[in-house]
Regions:
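Class II aminoacyl-tRNA synthetase catalytic cores and aaRS-like
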Residues: 1-506
Length: 506
């Protein structure tokens, strides 16, 4: 035994197989491979990498999470697991599809599902009141640490449900999972923020509440200001937002703020400049000259009281349209918090974000597009002004990461047609792409709602990893390739001929 409490004396040893080539890295219980060997090597020799204690633990954790979910939904709430098609129809309004050519219907294509969205809604019309699935999904999009071209969702849908019922069901589920696998006690109930509150206070719809820095609107402080940049912004209908960074004045130099790391991060979010002030001894301020000189004593006191500043604090400003100012400071809030290591990594922050806008304006295409997806139900109070409507949507946020998102759904064909028209899908296009769904809605569809969790991302967070590749047995690289099998690869000419594809040119 590993403990040494039992010793086995062997009389005969039979070698079942031999290692006939040198190993690219050692596999030991000390598990230092991840630090010493690049990920490309570990993915190329994944069968060895999976022997490591860390990977064994991660994949067994994944198994336990799925097992807990299945047992809870089936045993406690009588959900039915139903598989939906993998070969389906390409539809607009989403990421790029993976397409599969049909041999028996030349010139036509299946699409691999980005989610089981439409099929699970049709299951609600079919009389299955509680559906779930551990679903494989596919999206042809640019990759990053928490995205893969193929990924796994916990997918759920419930008929005759309310938003409150959906939130409670999912809070109970997550409390059960987190407690069982990590002895983590999540609050009851989960805190909630509306989309507008989250954006206004934290600059993001995925706020990390493990630290309490908040954005403040300081526009009133600078009304009538002689600082031209601020005055012009307010005159044109913009806002001035501020973020107070405790202790930031002693950490970041003026160079950091004018052209260094902090300024660079702000510019990535669209900032054209980064006005700042530092709170020095006796409440004196230092910073941008014209900004300082524009602050009369009573305005300075008003600003410092509003931000509750202390000696050594740093005040950062963003200006312009409210959405852009929020975005700039929201990005800086997270960047600086990581830089200063103020986030309590042992804490667990979970909340719901609700009341999302139904639509966002796509300035490139000059049209509205669905913020979530076009099957989300609008708030009944906003039916008279759908372009500005709030959605009956809800996202679950854990430590600043969206782990699940859902909504109540549209279940009447006339409402669905109106939503399609707003996002630029004509009645003819709607019939061609979604006629089968609209037909179902006309057969007595019940009210329904659902949610989907990114299972890979959820397990990644529970495992304390920074990449979902560390909780997937055989993941793709950031170039959407399998380092082990070399997929995707060229195929035989006859295979292309069978599909009526032209031969590839050399």
């Amino acid at each position: 035994m590993r403990t040494g409490t039992i010793e086995v004396v062997a009389h005969h040893v039979l070698v079942l197989n031999s290692v006939t080539r040198s190993l690219p890295f050692p596999v030991t219980t000390s598990d230092t491979v991840k630090e010493k060997f690049p990920e490309e090597i570990r993915l190329r020799f994944r069968v060895l990498d999976l022997r490591r204690p860390q990977m064994q633990s991660n994949l067994r954790l994944r198994h336990n999470v799925v097992k807990l979910i299945r047992r809870y939904l089936e045993d406690e709430h009588e959900f039915v697991e139903i598989e939906t098609p993998v070969l389906s129809k390409s539809t607009p309004e989403g990421a790029r599809d993976y397409l599969v050519p049909s041999r028996v219907q030349p010139g036509t294509f299946y699409a691999l599902p980005q989610s089981p969205q439409l099929f699970k809604q049709m299951l609600m019309v079919s009389g299955f009141e509680k559906y779930y699935q551990i679903a494989r999904c596919f999206r042809d999009e640019d990759l990053r640490a928490d995205r893969q071209p193929e990924f796994t969702q916990l997918d759920m849908e419930v008929a005759f449900t309310s938003m409150e019922d959906m939130l409670k069901l999912n809070e109970d589920l997550m409390r059960h999972v987190f407690q069982a696998v990590g002895d983590i006690k999540l609050p009851n109930p989960f805190p909630r923020l509306t989309y507008a509150e989250a954006m206004d206070r934290y600059g993001t719809d995925r706020p990390d509440l493990r630290f309490d820095w908040e954005l403040k609107d300081v526009s009133d402080v600078f009304l009538g200001s002689s600082f031209k940049v601020f005055a012009d912004t307010l005159e044109s209908g913009g806002v001035i937002k501020a973020l107070c960074v405790p202790g930031g004045a002693t950490v970041f130099s003026n160079t950091d703020l004018k052209k260094g790391t902090v300024y660079t991060e702000a510019s990535k979010a669209g900032a054209k400049g980064l006005p700042f002030l530092k709170v020095m001894e006796n409440g004196e301020l230092e910073g941008i000259g014209p900004l300082l000189s524009s602050l009369k004593p009573e305005k300075k006191d008003q600003l410092m009281e509003l931000l509750d500043t202390k000696t050594g604090d740093l005040i950062l400003f963003a200006l312009g349209e409210q959405s852009s100012a929020n975005q700039i400071l929201g990005r800086l809030r997270l960047f600086i918090a990581h830089k200063l290591e103020v986030i309590d990594t042992s804490a667990h922050s979970v909340l719901w974000v609700t009341d999302f806008p139904m639509f966002q304006w796509n300035s490139d295409e000059q049209r509205y597009e669905a913020l979530h997806h076009p099957f989300t139900a609008p708030n009944p109070e906003d039916m008279d002004d759908l372009p500005s409507a709030r959605a009956l949507a809800y996202d679950m946020i854990y430590n600043g990461v969206e782990i699940g998102g859902g909504s109540l759904r549209i279940y009447k064909s006339d409402v669905q047609q109106r939503i399609f028209e707003i996002i630029g899908i004509s009645p003819e296009q709607a019939e061609e792409k979604f006629g089968y769904l609209l037909e179902c809605f006309d057969m007595g569809a019940p009210p329904h709602g659902g949610i989907a969790y990114g299972l890979d991302r959820l397990v990644m967070l529970l495992a304390g990893e920074s990449s979902i590749r560390d909780v997937i047995a055989f993941p793709k690289t950031t170039t959407a390739q399998c380092a082990l099998t070399k997929a995707p690869s060229a195929v035989e000419p006859q295979q292309l001929k069978d599909l009526a594809f032209p031969k590839p040119t050399s």
